[in-house]
């Protein structure tokens, strides 16, 4: 995949393209991109994605926190795995936000990116205030020689709260992660959710009670952190993957105050890994975070948690994304 940020330096060849932020690069995105690739192959053209390095709403409101499923670097890596020809990175500026759909199609898609066919997701809108729809895009396309095609809608086989074939969206996945439903989120993403970051110093309490932990400082402050609780995770660093018992929360038994921490006990591992880059890949939430009446009661529960975590991970298979580290 060729990443093009500056078309004055690299002129893309004519293409079949689609537009989107593609946060999470989830199953719905993948289905849309597959259609772009198939049409491009049939037409003898390049396949292209027009996307944005920064969430458009954050550009317009610097206080907005998007709660990303994927950082810009993670998104590019996942898109590259899918195998499109071009990733056209468009800086979403206030000037771009003011373009009407027709201006966007003319000035950017046609003149800058050489788009010949535009594949529109079933519910996607673009242009100033997203005020126009598919029929408008078709009409503008005819005027400027871009054929606009409506993508087939993605039908999932996912059932949530007794509702079958739930439409997959980035918003749904965020909701699931906020509920700790990381296994259902993985079904929607088609890979297990992960956090990347650096191991930093902590309070050393875990070490004193027999469960030393590595405390994670997440790479991107806009990355979504799943719900508080205990999780079975894969821990990857130095090109090796280990089983881990992860806690997200405020550690109420130890009275950590309001400070939310992300700390993982790596099973059967006893070395310090301070300052190392690690990846935590979520498999299943085993329980919510609880306040115990004593440290001794907490220790008893941690032994049970470790046994359950190991059983879950031994029955699972580390996703390929858990092995990809910087």
Model-derived features: where do they sit?
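Short acidic-hydrophobic, aromatic-tinged amphipathic segments that line or gate anion-handling sites
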Residues: 2-8, 88
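Phosphate/ribose-recognition catalytic cores of enzymes acting on nucleotide-derived substrates
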Residues: 202-326
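A short acidic, often aromatic-flanked loop/helix-cap motif at beta-alpha or helix-coil junctions
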Residues: 9-13, 94-97, 154-161
